[in-house]
From Swiss-Prot:
Gene3D superfamilies: Ribosomal protein L14. Keywords: Ribonucleoprotein, Ribosomal protein, RNA-binding, rRNA-binding. This is Large ribosomal subunit protein uL14. GO terms for cellular component: cytosolic large ribosomal subunit. Belongs to the universal ribosomal protein uL14 family. Binds to 23S rRNA. Forms part of two intersubunit bridges in the 70S ribosome. It comes from Staphylococcus aureus (strain NCTC 8325 / PS 47). One of its GO terms (biological process) is translation. HAMAP family: Ribosomal_uL14. CDD domains: Ribosomal_uL14. InterPro entries: Ribosomal_uL14, Ribosomal_uL14_bac-type, Ribosomal_uL14_CS, Ribosomal_uL14_sf. Part of the 50S ribosomal subunit. Forms a cluster with proteins L3 and L19. In the 70S ribosome, L14 and L19 interact and together make contacts with the 16S rRNA in bridges B5 and B8.
Length: 122
């Protein structure tokens, strides 16, 4: 579960290393987000020469959470870290590579470009 002020690792090569959640998108007064949800973030730590800089306000989709998610068959999937991928307005990733596994739930959110770039889909 991701909420305001949560810090997440960035799982792409857009130049950001760590982001801080500003807002969870999708409904009035929505408090938490899970895998596949879009959030508004600010970049807290960035690599030099990257596409995004420190202080930029960006949109991101959550690809891994420590709390995990329950699937329809009754199984749970959890990860070791909270991670996101920075996206453009058309739901495509800003970077050209995705690092680490991503959850299968991104398919239902129409993030097929992220799923196809990921090295592993769990």
């Amino acid at each position: 579960m991701i909420q305001q002020e949560t810090r997440l690792k960035v799982a792409d090569n857009s130049g950001a290393r760590e982001v801080l959640t500003i807002k969870v998108l999708g409904g009035s007064g929505r408090k938490t987000a899970n895998i596949g949800d879009v959030i508004v973030c600010t970049v807290k730590n960035a690599t030099p020469g990257g596409v995004v800089k420190k202080g930029d306000v960006v949109k991101a989709v959550i690809v891994r959470t420590k709390s995990g998610v329950r699937r329809n068959d009754g199984s749970y999937i959890k990860f070791d870290e909270n991670a996101c991928v920075i996206i453009r307005d058309d739901k495509g990733p800003r970077g050209t590579r995705i690092f680490g596994p991503v959850a299968r739930e991104l398919r239902e959110g129409n993030f097929m470009k992220i799923v196809s770039l990921a090295p592993e889909v769990l």
